[in-house]
Amino acid sequence: MARPKPETFDKQKTVAENRRARFDYAVEDKFEAGIALQGTEVKALRAGEASIAESYAEVRDGEAWLINANIPEYSHGNRLNHQPRRPRKLLLHNREIERLLGAVERKGMTLVPLSIYFNSRGRAKVELALAKGRQAQDKREYIKDRDWKRDKARIMRDKG
């Protein structure tokens, strides 16, 4: 008889989120990629310690890499602890890597990590966005639209 799933893995658990990326970039497409991590990195992520605010992804030699993501050293780690800002390999299919590479080279887009989370099976994943940078004018328009939607929702809520 199959063993029931533990309750901790019923849904995904977000570890780090890059909220600024949604403001600075216009997100065109999203991808889910696995990350090749060392043991102490997984333990540090499970402890909820990570920052992807200044990180980005790039394709080098047919492989995708997460650059400048900060996963601090594990507090109970020994001399074999990991480097906090080392490049981490992203696990994607070759078709996905070729598609990302084509978009980045031809259309001038950027690969931005939106979040790091554990999926229902307990595997660490990165949500990558294929995005285009916003100019200052675009950001102002985005803020106006967001404020109008918020005001509209407030008006509808107060009337009903």
Curated annotation (Swiss-Prot):
Localization terms from the record: Cytoplasm
Q: Superkingdom of this entry's organism?
A: Bacteria
- A Gene Ontology term for the protein's cellular component: cytosol
Give GO terms: molecular function aspect only. Answer: RNA binding
> Which keywords does this chain's UniProt record carry?
Cytoplasm, RNA-binding
- Which InterPro entries does its entry note? SmpB, SsrA-bd_prot, SsrA-bd_prot_CS
Asked whether the keyword Transmembrane is assigned, the reply is no
Q: Name one GO biological process term.
A: trans-translation
One Pfam family name is SmpB
Question: Among its keywords, does the record have RNA-binding?
Answer: yes
First-listed, main subcellular location of the protein, grouped into a coarse class: cytoplasm
Family of the protein in this entry: Belongs to the SmpB family.
Function description: Required for rescue of stalled ribosomes mediated by trans-translation. Binds to transfer-messenger RNA (tmRNA), required for stable association of tmRNA with ribosomes. tmRNA and SmpB together mimic tRNA shape, replacing the anticodon stem-loop with SmpB. tmRNA is encoded by the ssrA gene; the 2 termini fold to resemble tRNA(Ala) and it encodes a 'tag peptide', a short internal open reading frame. During trans-translation Ala-aminoacylated tmRNA acts like a tRNA, entering the A-site of stalled ribosomes, displacing the stalled mRNA.
Instruction: Spell out the HAMAP family in the cross-references.
Output: SmpB
NCBIfam families given in the database record: PRK05422.1, smpB
Q: What is this protein identified as?
A: SsrA-binding protein
Q: Which organism is it from?
A: Erythrobacter litoralis (strain HTCC2594)
Question: Corresponding gene?
Answer: smpB
